[in-house]
């Protein structure tokens, strides 16, 4: 479970995807790009935050 994740609008999510794609087109790995954008979002986000729970369902 992750607490304090930014709650993003669809437009904000789309901009994040575009930023990740831009970084990857410049040679950054997908993992690095995602981590960087996530860090930027957390640092700059001033809106609501959510609690998210991720579970692996390999069964």
UniProtKB/Swiss-Prot annotation:
Pfam family name, one? UPF0181
Cross-referenced InterPro entries:
UPF0181
Quote the NCBIfam families the UniProt record gives.
Answer: PRK05114.1 (NF003476)
Q: Record's family?
A: Belongs to the UPF0181 family.
Protein name, per record: UPF0181 protein YoaH
Biological source species = Escherichia coli O127:H6 (strain E2348/69 / EPEC)
Provide the gene name from the record: yoaH
């Amino acid at each position: 479970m992750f607490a304090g994740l930014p709650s993003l609008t669809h437009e904000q999510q789309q901009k994040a995807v575009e930023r990740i794609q831009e970084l990857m087109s410049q040679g950054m790995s997908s993992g690095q790009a995602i981590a960087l954008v996530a860090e930027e979002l957390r640092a700059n986000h001033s809106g609501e935050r959510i609690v998210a729970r991720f579970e692996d369902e390999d069964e």
